[in-house]
């Protein structure tokens, strides 16, 4: 993995737009915010990715994540098996768009060429978000009166699980090159992501559809980060194993 034994990092936060007051579970709109956020950042990686798959929501991963969120534990699920995982906690509200943005924000600390993270920083959230082969995501959220492992009370806990998991030792999150130039067989390029047939059909049925291009060339893990946010201060606590 990328690092270990990371000390707490304290940052200041000014949030202008706060959305989502998630309770015991996520609404369809909230699920869309999370999924769209992941796909947006995956499509915008720099340098571009040759093989970035478009993510889709998975009900089984959602149920798995929700069940763990209900336990209100500030630690990774030791029984998650072959599932990637990102955790995020925030008070007094839960801003889902900001959560994904924050995970992706670790990009500035990550060097794709050397596959290294700036010492003392975290990159595991980001690399899971943009892990090219990860194509399924499911998340759960819970308002916890008390989260085991956090002193503060009244926190929202977000758990996202991924399949297949990212952050595999010795591997980069994606291959740099012309967008979609190495999409798997049967997938087409939609907004710089390798999308399946269903995604293409949905775009064709939409009045404001984006362009759909064929890949320019044919083609025949687990995040261990924790993010805790308390307004108006941000406390980023994490460890990568």
Report the location of each language-model feature.
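Mature extracellular or exoplasmic CAP/SCP-family domains and secreted bioactive peptides
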Residues: 2-241
């Amino acid at each position: 993995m990328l690092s270990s034994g990371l000390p707490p990092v304290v940052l200041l936060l000014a949030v202008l737009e706060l959305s989502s007051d998630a309770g015991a579970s996520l609404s369809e709109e909230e699920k869309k915010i999370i999924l769209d956020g992941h796909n947006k950042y995956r499509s915008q990686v720099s340098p571009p990715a040759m093989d970035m798959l478009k993510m889709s929501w998975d009900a089984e991963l959602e149920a798995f994540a929700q069940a763990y969120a209900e336990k209100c534990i500030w630690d990774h699920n030791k029984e998650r098996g072959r599932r990637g995982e990102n955790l995020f906690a925030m008070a007094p509200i839960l801003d889902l768009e900001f959560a994904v943005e924050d995970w992706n924000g670790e990009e500035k600390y990550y060097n794709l060429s050397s596959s290294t993270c700036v010492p003392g920083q975290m990159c595991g959230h980001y690399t899971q978000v943009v892990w090219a082969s990860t194509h399924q995501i499911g998340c759960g959220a819970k308002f916890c009166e008390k989260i085991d492992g956090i002193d503060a009370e009244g926190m929202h806990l977000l758990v996202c699980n991924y399949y297949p998991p990212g952050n595999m030792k010795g591997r980069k999150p994606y291959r740099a090159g012309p967008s979609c130039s190495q999409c798997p067989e049967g997938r087409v390029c939609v907004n710089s992501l390798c999308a399946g047939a269903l995604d293409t059909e949905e775009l064709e049925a939409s009045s404001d559809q984006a362009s759909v291009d064929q890949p320019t060339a044919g083609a025949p893990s687990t995040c261990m980060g924790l993010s805790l946010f308390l307004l108006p201060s941000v406390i980023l606590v994490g460890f990568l194993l």
